[in-house]
Amino acid sequence: DVYKRQDQTIFTALKQVLQELNFEYCPIDVELTESCLIENDELALSVIQQFSQLGAQVHLDDFGTGYSSLSQLARFPIDAIKLDQVFVRDIHKQPVSQSLVRAIVAVAQALNLQVIAEGVESAKEDAFLTKNGINERQGFLFAKPMPAVAFERWYKRYLKRA
């Protein structure tokens, strides 16, 4: 929403909050879609640079389903690509998806980008992704969306297991 409105106040407010809390780094990951990069590349570059200057990580969301262009990966200073769930779903049974994921991981590694898999729902999907170098995964296999209070309880239990 900030991106679409070209609202610069978010950067000032975020910087102020980080200073007030004495954070040494910004614990926020910002996600932009591929279409954001296409719609207004100058604005996208400015937004990415401003968030990066605050220490936020910038992720390219739903990678591979929009206007994918490898040139975007080289042009925009992002930190991670989020592999869309269409590649993840039943990947252990889909040879084409397996090949595409391996290729995407290879490109990301060559560009020093992190890869995050979205939509992981089964242990078999998780095993394939882990085996192929994707160390961050999201999806119902790990937790479903939940209210903040429920998340706090879940997180405390998670820390006890870790």
Where in this protein do the model-derived segments appear?
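Charged helix-capping and loop-helix junction motifs
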Residues: 10-16, 43-46, 95-102
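Short, small-residue-biased leader/transition segments that mark boundaries at the very start
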Residues: 2-3
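Residue-level marker of structural boundaries
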Residues: 78, 96-97, 156, 160
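Cytochrome P450 core scaffold surrounding the K-helix E-X-X-R motif
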Residues: 7-8, 86
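C-terminal helical cap(s) of enzyme catalytic domains, especially alpha/beta-barrels
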Residues: 130, 146-162
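The catalytic core of metal-dependent phosphodiesterases that act on cyclic dinucleotides
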Residues: 15-91, 107, 111-145
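Switch/connector loops and helix/strand junctions flanking conserved nucleotide-binding motifs
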Residues: 6-7, 39
